[in-house]
Each structure stands twice: as C-alpha cells, then as structure tokens.
Amino acid sequence: MDSEQVIAIEEKKGETEPASMIAAGPERFINRELSWLHFNRRVLEESVNPHHPVLERVRFLSISANNLDEFFMVRVAGIKAQIREGITERSPDGLTPSEQLGLINEAVSKLASDQQSIWRDLRGVLADSGILLLDGKDVTKAERAWIEDHFLHNIFPLLTPLAIDPAHPFPFIPSLGFTIGLQLARVSDGRPMNALIRMPARIDRFIRLPGNGRDQTVRVMTLEQATSLFIGRLFPGYHVKGQGSFRIIRDSELEIEEEAEDLVRLFETALKRRRRGSVIRMEVDSSMPEELRVFVQRALTAADDEVFLVDGVLAMNELSQLTRVDRPDLEFVPYVPRHPERVRDHGGDIFAAIRQKDLIVHHPYESFDVVVQFLQQAARDPDVVAIKQTLYRTSNNSPIVRALAEAAEAGKSVTALVELKARFDEEANIRWARDLERAGVQVVYGFLQLKTHAKLSLVVRREGGSLTTYIHTGTGNYHPVTARIYTDLSYFTSDPILGRDAARVFNYITGYAEPSDIEKMAVSPITLRKTMLEHIRGETAFAKHGKPAAIWLKMNALVDPEIIDALYEASRAGVSVELVVRGICCLRPGVPGLSDNIRVKSIIGRFLEHGRIYCFGNGYGLPSAKAAVYISSADMMPRNLDRRVEVLCPMLNPTVHQQVLEQIMVANLKDTEQSWRLLPDGSSTRMKAAKGEEPFNVHNYFMTNPSLSGRGKSLQESSPRRLTRRAERQQSQQSS
C-alpha cells in the first residue's frame, strides 16, 4: 500500500467515523517518519523559492540532502534494526516497522528524484549568473593543462588506487565515503580487473579554475570529474572499460552498555564500532555498468532495497561548498547581530545589566557574544567564586570552553557537565572534557540512561557580604557558530528563586539528588511532562467553564501521544490552540470534532527556527499579562520528556514576559512569507497573506526592530501586536 492510499484511507476515516472513534484509534496520529519527510520537503521547497538568491537556494538543496543522510543514519537504521530483530510492535499511528520502511522508501524515492530535478534547474540558473559547472568535455586545452597540474600537485598525492583481487580484498568504505568504481583491462593482454579510488574527505569537492580576467564568470569542476580525466596516472598499463561513482551510508546509532565503569572509554569503544556499522543505503551513479554495480553491492553486503540508482550528482550535501565562491550578490545580504543596549549602558558589565532587570537575548538577531561575555566576565571577576555549566554541543576552539578553563586556572570552583551522548558530537565532547579536566575543571558526565540536554549556566558571586546567583538558561546550545543562524532565546536573571532551582538541577545531575523541592522551574524527566499537562488541562477546564482559554506553543517537534491527546481534548472543549512546529508534527490539525480549534504552522526561512516557547492564557486568553509563559530546551517528544534532563523556565519579569509573548510569539504567528500551514493528512501548503493584509516576514522584522529587554522604546509603534491591530483597523474601514 503506497502513501497516497494510506492518506486517502485516513482522510476517509476522518470523514465517516465519529470523532470519538478517531480519538480512540491510531488514525489520530500522523506517522513520525512521514511527518519528518514532509518537513524535509518544506526545506527542499526553499531551493525553488524565487525570492531567495541562487546560492542560498543551492544551500537549501544541500541542507535537505544532509538532512536525508542523517535520517537514514539514525531513523531508518533504527527501523531496519527492528525488522532484523523480528519486532512487529506498531507505531502510535498503527504501522509495523516493515510498513513504515515501505512508505519511507517510496517517499524518499520521490524526494531524491525531485532533488536531482531541482539541481538540474539550479545549474542553469547558476550558469546564467556566471557560475559554470564543467564536465570533462567542456574544458579548453589551457584549462585541461591547468587541471592536470592541479591534480598532480594537490589531488594525486592523496589518492590510493585500490585493485581488487585475492591478494587485495575489498577495502572498508566509511559512512558517506565517496568512491569511484572501475572496470579495467590490462593493455598487454586484456586481463580484467576491478578497482576503486576513494575520494579524499578533507579536500574541497569543487575545484575553481582560473578566471580569464575579463569578467566575473566562475568555472568549476568536481573532484571526481578531475580525477576521471587522469585515471591513467593512477593505473598505468590499464585502460578503463567502465566506471561509476557510489556512496554509502552506514548505521550510525550508538549501542551503549548499561553497566560501565568508565563512561569515556565506553564511548570511545562505541564510536569505533559505529564507524563500521552496517550499510543501510548505497547510492550509485546510474551510468555505472551493472556488472560493476553488482560486484560493489555484494562486497558491501547491501540488500537490493538498499541500493538507489542516481541519475545526477551524488553527495548533494556537499553542494553547499559552492556557496564559498566570492559572489556576495548571489547570497543573502550579510546580517550583523545587535548587542543588547542595556549591557552597553552598563559599560559592558553583564552582571550590572542583569541586576537592573532580567534580560532576554533573541538570537541570531542579538549577538551570542553576550553569552560568551557572561562566562568570560565570570572567569575574570575576582568576586566570582563558582561557575557551573552544561555543555551539549559547542564549536571548535570554543570560547565557552576557554572561559571555563580560564576560571578554573584562576582558582574558582568550576563544574562542567559534558554530555557524551550528543549525537555526532561525541568525539568532540570527549576532547573538550579532557581539555577541561587538564585545566582543573570538575567534569561530570551526567546519567548513563539520560541525556542532559538542558542549557544552563550558574555563576555565584560575592556581593556585599553575601552570595548572589546569576543564571543563564536558553533554548539553544552554547555554540557561537550555530547561534548565527538558529533562532533561540537566552534568558539572564539573578532571581533568587530561579537561582535556587538551577542549583538543584545541577545537584541532580552531579549527585543524583532528585530535585523534589524545585519552586518555579520544571525539570524532565521529573516534573516537565506533568507541568505541561497541568497547563493544557487547565485551559481545557477554563473553556468548559466559559472562560477565555488559549494555548500558543512553539517547538521543533510535537510527537508525544499524551501531550497530543491533551491538546485534542482542549480543542474539543473549545480552547484556541496555535502551534508553531518547525519539524515533525504527529498531531492532525483541523479534523472536525477532534481538532477543529487547532492550527499548526511551520516556519522555514533564512534562519533555522529552534526556540521552544510555551504560553497558556491562564483564564485570560492570549496574549495577556497574566498568561503563563515559559521557554525551554525541550520539544514535546517522549525522549525530551522521559529520557533527557531538560529545563522549563517561567518568564516572571513583566518586560521579559511581554517580549516573549507579545513580541516574539505574536510575530511568529503573524508571519505569512515563510510559513506553511499543516493539513490534516500531514502535508503542508505555503501560506499567503489574506486579501488586503500586508505580508509579514518574521525574520526580516526581528532583523530591523530592537527587543523589549534591551531598551525597546522604539518598538512601541512597530510591535507585532500594534501592526496586527493596525491591519485589523484598516480591514474594518475597508469593509465598512
């Protein structure tokens, strides 16, 4: 049964069955994997968005390909493992692992085909813009001579020709390894031989040829094309009978034993095993001779349904390298983040700025430097006595790590929770942990069974004969690089209650002291799920008693069945539910009798939406100064609520509360230029401004308007709420 049939059946059920039956059955959920593929389709659609410069469109295409690679490494690998183990347990939406895999393969086939079609179109747009991708037949004599010289000096020394025969068995190919397969024949006697050339991973995929000096035209050739021109240099005495490229993806899930004496060594061993995970996808250039393809497939023990013929370019995730060409006119205009004005008002003293009033910093519109500055100032301030920090992901040469090391070397008490289980950052985190330990930092690794995903810093400072606790908590990682492109929130406060709560969270992580006396925050896996359900059910009760009831939630993924069912119940009670979900959404919006009052949108644009914001009207509707407003590191997924340490932090200060609710959330709900409306079948359609309504772009808005918790006086006439009211007045005047 294909995906269209499944959707048609589900739509028919939604039309003919009572809502009570739908609510009780698996039909009320959208399949998680198919929902993710719908999300990646939205990312891919940005590569055909004519409003984006062409190199940004190439970047979106590359991102969609990279996303798909990771999806296979983790999600598809997990489903295949279930099938191998004979597991037939159904997903919440009622599909067995085998049924899910069939639907995934069908959807991926269409997605991958569309990626290639879009790439062919983009090549034409690039050519029209003066960026030409060359085949071997396209180069001039002079260019071929230059390529040969470049090949001999910069590529040839990195290549190892690998003959395959009884004395030279088929070599190990790493995950994402790009390889040229060859059918050769010896010139002297015609004796056949198969061979491989693995493309080196640490050099650029695209080679830029010298310009002619007369115009801006950029001429580019791929590494594999250049290598193919000079295969004779690698296999002298042989001629090529057939060739083709292939690329593999391996299972990248880590298997961790529950009993371990040394967690670091355990992870080092597991990482070595992961490099040799089984092949789950083999992409093959469709021009490769069948005999050669079968030879490679058997050597890699890839099943027939794991082999994908590609009529186009392999490793599309590497297309982002093309954006390095010096053509700023073909990219987004660079954006320089603002620095919070209140910190400037205090001469850069971050502690003085926080003492004056709580502060929300909205990344990437406001600089992540203020987070780095918070820790650097703490490291150098003689009155700071202790620092505690969680690290889930950070950047190479991280200023966060340097600040913690500097603080320890200055004699301060520094504790760092380094999460070894951060997927694909495990090796980097082991390295950071050892660097920090050498500097004198007390490094802990949290729980074996739980990932610590909370974003939390705590600084204890001696002030006026007593100790003051300053905290930073946020929705994003302590990663200065991703903070330039991810939308996230950083919250700074010296509120003593939140300071005590943060200290209890750290005690929980470092000493297993379960925080039963937390006052304002909520922590998973202990109280976060309970807190969310209490608020959702509270709004349901308000609606049933005729009071205003509203829920606004912004997150990356909505998967948890219990949370979804609570939202369905709220909708049936009459609660207005507005959801902004960037990625996976297993909730079906707009189903009569089930989710009539739930609207779901997804924002895909220049920046990656990453912040989690949870707002509840509290009996007053939304927006309201009396609403309950939180930010969090947690999405609404079982893993976040039950298998991770996460923090849900309330916005208690009125200015911060207003900024998050009435500026940030309202702007996200108002966006029409980058938003997609999710439909009951799990697909989505691009939103458009209503007739007479001015289009609104949330990213452009925040790039050009200051935040409330900086100083924000200039915001009063241009806030999203004010703009909304103005538009409503104009529509009212037009209709009258």
UniProtKB/Swiss-Prot annotation:
Residues 703-736 are annotated as: Disordered. Its EC number is 2.7.4.1. ATP binds at N67, Y486, R582, H610. GO terms for biological process: polyphosphate biosynthetic process. It is an enzyme of class 2 (transferase). GO terms for molecular function: ATP binding; metal ion binding; polyphosphate kinase activity. It comes from the Bacteria. It catalyses: [phosphate](n) + ATP = [phosphate](n+1) + ADP. It holds the Pfam family PP_kinase_N. InterPro entries: PP_kinase, PP_kinase_C_1, PP_kinase_middle, PP_kinase_middle_dom_sf, PPK_C_dom2, PPK_N_dom, PPK_N_dom_sf. The keyword Magnesium applies. NCBIfam families: poly_P_kin (TIGR03705), PRK05443.1-1 (NF003917), PRK05443.1-2 (NF003918), PRK05443.1-4 (NF003919), PRK05443.2-2 (NF003921). HAMAP family: Polyphosphate_kinase (MF_00347). This is Polyphosphate kinase. The lineage of its organism: Bacteria, Pseudomonadati, Pseudomonadota, Alphaproteobacteria, Hyphomicrobiales.
